[in-house]
Amino acid sequence: MLKTRIITALILVSLVILTTIFLEPVWFLFISSLFVLVGIWEWFKLFSSRVDGYIHYFWIFPVVFMCFIGQPISFVLSNYSISTVYLFEHSPVFYVVIYLSLAFFWLVIAPLMIINYQKKLFFNPYLVITDLKGKRSWSDLMIGPEGTWMNFFLGNFLLWGMWLNLVILLFNNPYILLFLFLIIWSADIAAYFSGKKYGKHTLADNVSPSKTWEGVIGGLIAGILTAFLALHFFREFLGVDMIQASPIKLILLSSVTVIYSIVGDLFISIIKRDAGKKDTGILFPGHGGILDRIDSLMAGSVAFMFWGIFLGLFDFGLL
């Protein structure tokens, strides 16, 4: 199993590096879009008993979403050197609302959902917290047509929002995007092995019994070390603000990114646990599905951009 995991991981890492650094951006856009579509399908299948009657609506939101961003993305594809600030200058309300909504969900809502799930409380999207009692979990809200549309919107919003986040990083500086990938990858690997070897204290046993505090510490250390190593090796490719960043800012950025990558992992674990599934799919041998591989990236990428801008390490014209 470990050998299979390693081989699959090496193939995926090679694909990401190839499309991020060496190929034209259109390849990253195309392949990442396919990944997102499969991820949305997996999301729906986790709620299969609730969405079977509405699965034919699967394509509506992606098509509408792509219509909104099609014009500015097409412009960028025709001129790779243009800053993504263009996107926000021409559709400011749409993009700012998308980005800030993503940030609010991952930085505030998702952690609250995880904490309350761990404490066996019922947390719904209207921020009403009550004891579970008759309800199985927050996802019981997904039952019926209204719940299906809630589930439908949330899955598309989180996944396409992540995609847009990665595209912004790519077109501003592909090495900053690779910087993000390396932090999350190293943290995932270190958390897995340190958790298996030293893990004794569970992080959130009701959410994911295999996650431990020792794994979190291992992931944090690896993420911070990777950030410093990446800064050293990519120095000539990163922006001036990144190169001149103080060690404290770099530690903060990498730490927050790792912490919220764990939030993304735990959030998807909640959905899998509610669905009674171990994995979201079977696409990647030894790893599960798309959502199993990008759960950390869904939250980590948002935290990375938000705190990178907040700390003054890069400015994409978002805030």
Label the predicted regions.
Residues 2-212, 216-255:
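Membrane-embedded alpha-helical bundles of polytopic integral membrane proteins
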Residues 255-263, 290-298:
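Hydrophobic transmembrane alpha-helical segments of multi-pass transport and channel proteins
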Residues 308-319:
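Juxtamembrane boundary at the C-terminal end of a transmembrane helix
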Residues 274-297:
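Interfacial loop-to-transmembrane junctions
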Residues 186-196, 260-273:
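Short helical (or helix-break) motifs at transmembrane helix termini and adjacent helical loops
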Residues 196-197, 272-275, 298, 303:
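Re-entrant/interfacial helical elements at transmembrane boundaries that shape
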Residues 5, 115-117, 269, 296, ...:
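Feature representing long, continuous alpha-helical segments
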Residues 293-310:
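Final/C-terminal transmembrane alpha-helix of multipass membrane proteins
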